[in-house]
Amino acid sequence: MLQLDFHQQLGSLELHVQSELPANGITAIFGVSGAGKTSLINAVVGLTRPDGGRIVLNDHVLVDTQQRVFLPPEKRHIGYVFQDARLFPHYRVRGNLRYGMAEKMASQFDDIVNLLGIEHLLNRYPLTLSGGEKQRVAIGRALLTAPELLLMDEPLASLDLPRKRELLPYLERLAKEVNIPILYVSHSLEEIVRLADHVVVLDKGKVKAQGLLEEVWASSALRPWLPKDEQSSILSVRVLAQHEHYAMTALALDDQQVWVGKVELAQDAVLRIRVNAADVSLVLQPPEKSSIRNVLRASVEECIDVDGQVEVKLAVGQQTLWSRITPWARDDLALHPGQMLYAQIKSVSITA
């Protein structure tokens, strides 16, 4: 676990962070440019010194200003992947990977190389690598130092779209197969949806929201950054069954089910789906005959008027589903908090 309780004045920005981050999975640090994202992880790794407070990683005190404790970066056991890979140009890939490698990681060298798909690059120099290949090597080098925590500062920011698409699957594999907590700085909501388990939203140096991705996404914290036509819900589901006759998979959403195109995952595998608010219509009674496969029981939590539309927050079991309808539809259905109804979902996408 990473415990943060510190403040730091950085020019006109006052960074004040109070948070406990989990000891597993990817925690995304999200915010616009200047929100304090990179400043936060620089304080964690020891590149800057907080003005006051404590930083504790797995019960090891890294910073305690009252006790005058400030552990230097090289003693914190933290890996750092920068926006630019920062490889040594005079070393081949193999040499870059072995630079700073912990003795106990020698036996895992081949596993990490295979995980990142860089076996064929070992004898090449950094100048001959693409941006995505350089970042994979940088990630491998960080992992081979045997870190207790891995920091990634917008690792896709300097890459063009094809290179981003090349690297994302490796990051997804990394999150699932390497048992090291990762702090992932990004201002891209798409990256967060694909990769993050937890999210911390920073705004002007302060924590605006934090928690599981599904919970933070369902709150109002991220909604200002989403274009009007991209307001959506993230739902946690698990594989229930495959359709006997059609290429469709049933996913369990609490005590209900959602049908999606065939998913090649084992039964009970957990994944996330994304549903755009504009693809959710509301009815008071379930339709008898309809082309829409997914009709879920839901209850109204609140209705919010936004730019001439109404965003309806629905409770589906323990999770939140958003619908966007017209004021006319809201009035016609006489929507009010606590009302039971049915949500018709026209389209579902798999995120992770």
Swiss-Prot record:
Residues 1-229 form the ABC transporter domain. InterPro entries: AAA+_ATPase, ABC_transporter-like_ATP-bd, ABC_transporter-like_CS, Mo/tungstate-bd_C_term_dom, ModC_ABC_ATP-bd, Molybdenum_import_ModC, Mop_domain, P-loop_NTPase. Residues 289-352 form the Mop domain. The keyword Nucleotide-binding applies. SUPFAM superfamilies: MOP-like, P-loop containing nucleoside triphosphate hydrolases. GO terms for molecular function: ABC-type molybdate transporter activity; ATP binding; ATP hydrolysis activity. Its EC number is 7.3.2.5. It comes from the Bacteria. It is found in: Cell inner membrane. It is a peripheral membrane protein. ATP binds at G31, V32, S33, G34, A35, G36, K37, T38. It catalyses: molybdate(out) + ATP + H2O = molybdate(in) + ADP + phosphate + H(+). GO terms for cellular component: plasma membrane. The keyword tRNA-binding does not apply. Keywords: ATP-binding, Cell inner membrane, Cell membrane, Membrane, Molybdenum, Nucleotide-binding, Translocase, Transport. Its main location: membrane. Part of the ABC transporter complex ModABC involved in molybdenum import. Responsible for energy coupling to the transport system. The complex is composed of two ATP-binding proteins (ModC), two transmembrane proteins (ModB) and a solute-binding protein (ModA). Belongs to the ABC transporter superfamily. Molybdate importer (TC 3.A.1.8) family. This is Molybdenum import ATP-binding protein ModC. It comes from Pectobacterium atrosepticum (strain SCRI 1043 / ATCC BAA-672). The gene is modC.
